[in-house]
Amino acid sequence: MTPTLVRHHLSHAGSPPRVNLGARARDWSEIQERMLVPLYETVHERLEVGPATRLLGLRCGSGLALLMAATRGAAVTGVDSSPERLALARERLLPDPAPGARARGRAARIVEGTPRDAADAQAPAYNLITAFDPIGCRADDAGRLGDLLAEATPLAEVGAAVVLAGWGPPERCATSSVLRVAARLADPLRSAGSWRPARRDDLEEVAQRAGLRIDGSGRVSCPFGYADVDSAVRGLLSTGLFDAGISATDEEQVGKEVAEALHPHRRADGTVWMPNVFRYLIARVR
């Protein structure tokens, strides 16, 4: 159960944190990615995603949102910089057919790299771009999303919808109290990628800088629920939001701090439950 939730950014001095990227990708796919399913469903319903949709998913991760769009009949392309997550996306969207079986549905494309690498001169322009990896928790995430949009929007037709997602107000997101651990542990590095509270106009500012026309917005309840504290720690670390703290200390120390911060959200049966609200913005390509 999502951006992100903001993922695979480099830590201070450009060096990656000391983590097992394969294990982290599996934790993202198996634990954390589904947390944003209500967001995906709401957007797909509102925009009537279906057989006429040609979708480009930015930071598509292990492909759950793409799979949900594909089951509605959309032609989907996903792009991401994480080979570990994309390997899982390919397993979901491009499974090996059984011998003699006929392929069902429309083919998906999974692209490693940047949006520019998803260009296909032989295919029609995209009419929907999604950036479901939520911004609003890192000092540098809006700028990074802007860079992706600068490459992606030329691949879309005029009037195409562009969906941006972000964390809601800290007071509406119980997970914010846990994410403050990231800021405290990363503080010695003064890292540009460390956590910060979401701001009200984060999404609007990104859309305006990208030259998009704002066309609507909404809020969606996306509670984070975990079977136990260990699953919660693994899921949250898989987002990448704690990478600066891991670089400043180590993964074990960060895990202990996160587990302690989760105690107020632990229920009598051992499960962890944190209500959150996420925002989405719909903009249009001019």
PLM region spans:
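Conserved class I S-adenosyl-L-methionine
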Residues: 1-53, 85-88, 95-98, 104
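Conserved Class I S-adenosyl-L-methionine
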Residues: 3, 62-64, 204-286
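A short acidic, Gly/Pro-enriched loop at the edge of an enzyme's catalytic core
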Residues: 116-129
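Helix-to-beta-strand junctions that scaffold the AdoMet/dcAdoMet cofactor pocket
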Residues: 139-140, 156-158
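Conserved catalytic/acceptor-binding region of the Class I
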Residues: 147, 153, 159-225
